[in-house]
């Protein structure tokens, strides 16, 4: 992604060299010893820097994906932390970044590493979720009721095994989505609501094997051109994902098997139809589901978390 080289925001130098993948993985996890007030102030500073990064690079989709993929490895059937996976910052390590489902996410990590370096007291686990929620909000989406104070895992040996994240084209899409999301403790309503985040971003065939090399909506960027988007305005968070899947009138818009099934499965369809007709209802349910996802598997210090509001 070309935006990796456009780190123009307050306090960061565009001339600063990007760290290597190996260097990123060796960065130490942050200490949680700071007082809650100081921690909140540092988190607010990081949030402002994320906003500037979004303005200068239009990297909203990949930051959303970064937060999701760190949290989405959670297994409710495993009680031991961090073996349960989830939002613990493990995605910063090379071994997990190389999982097939995480193709391209090293670019997201390189984008936000300067923010991590500037705000050393913010954990990777918090920064990933902060960046994801902020990207949703800055793209026009709902305010996510976030809390912070997540503890980082310390070493790559604590990364979850590969295969816990959803695939795009499984043989039985509805069964696959339920297997993955039920394992996290999420419901059919939350599956459909969270799927609506595909209103942002593009699929690149060289990474996922899905989508066209380019379309009329993506051939000129912003950012690196190419890929196929789910919606025509793929940097705007709204309910057009559901409308476009339902109508299927534009061959330049992507519909994966796991997208189409939202209007084919009888339980999923209830929510997909609702969200296509009512953006406010979608925003309300999405904000709740996103916040829940961001907390999966997280260990908080302080135990009740830190609010920025």
UniProtKB/Swiss-Prot annotation:
Active-site residues (renumbered): 69 (proton acceptor)
GO molecular function, one term: L-ascorbate peroxidase activity
Record keywords: Calcium, Chloroplast, Heme, Hydrogen peroxide, Iron, Metal-binding, Mitochondrion, Oxidoreductase, Peroxidase, Plastid, Potassium, Transit peptide
Record flagged with keyword RNA-binding: no
SUPFAM superfamilies: Heme-dependent peroxidases
Binding site for K(+): 199, 231, 238
Subcellular location: Plastid, Chloroplast stroma; Mitochondrion
Required cofactor(s): heme b
Chief location of this protein within or outside the cell: plastid
Gene Ontology process terms (BP): cellular response to oxidative stress; hydrogen peroxide catabolic process; response to reactive oxygen species
GO cellular component, one term: chloroplast stroma
Residue ranges of the TM segments: none
Region annotated Disordered, chain positions: 197-229
InterPro entries: Ccp1-like, Haem_peroxidase, Haem_peroxidase_sf, Peroxidase_I, Peroxidases_heam-ligand_BS
Cofactor note: Binds 1 heme b (iron(II)-protoporphyrin IX) group.
Function: Plays a key role in hydrogen peroxide removal.
Misc remark: Binds one cation per subunit; probably K(+), but might also be Ca(2+).
Protein name: Probable L-ascorbate peroxidase 6, chloroplastic/mitochondrial
Originating species: Oryza sativa subsp. japonica (Rice)
């Amino acid at each position: 992604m070309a935006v990796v080289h456009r780190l123009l925001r307050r306090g960061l130098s565009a001339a600063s060299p990007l760290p290597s993948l190996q260097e990123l993985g060796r960065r130490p996890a942050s200490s949680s010893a700071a007082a809650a007030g100081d921690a909140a102030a540092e988190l607010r500073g990081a949030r402002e820097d994320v906003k500037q990064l979004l303005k200068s690079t239009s990297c909203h989709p990949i930051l959303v994906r970064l937060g999701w993929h760190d949290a989405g490895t959670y297994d409710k059937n495993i009680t031991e932390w961090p073996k349960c996976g989830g939002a613990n910052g493990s995605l910063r390590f090379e071994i997990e970044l190389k999982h097939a489902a995480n193709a391209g996410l090293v670019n997201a990590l390189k984008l936000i590493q300067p923010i991590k370096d500037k705000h050393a007291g913010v954990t990777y686990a918090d920064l990933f979720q902060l960046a994801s929620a902020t990207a949703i909000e800055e793209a026009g989406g709902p305010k996510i009721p976030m809390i912070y104070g997540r503890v980082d895992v310390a070493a790559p040996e604590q990364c979850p095994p590969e295969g816990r994240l959803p695939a795009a084209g499984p043989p039985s899409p509805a069964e696959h989505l339920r297997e993955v999301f039920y394992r996290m403790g999420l419901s059919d309503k939350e599956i459909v609501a969270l799927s609506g985040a595909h209103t942002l971003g593009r699929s690149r065939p060289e990474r996922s094997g899905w989508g066209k090399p380019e379309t009329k909506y993506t051939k000129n960027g912003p950012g690196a051109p190419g890929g196929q988007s789910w919606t025509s305005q793929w940097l705007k968070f709204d309910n057009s994902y559901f409308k476009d899947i339902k109508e299927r009138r534009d061959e330049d818009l992507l519909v994966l098997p796991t997208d189409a099934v939202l209007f084919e499965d009888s339980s999923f369809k209830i929510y997909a139809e609702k969200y296509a007709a009512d953006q406010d209802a979608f925003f309300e349910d999405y904000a709740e589901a996103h916040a829940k996802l961001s907390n999966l598997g997280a260990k908080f210090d302080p135990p009740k978390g830190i609010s920025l509001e």
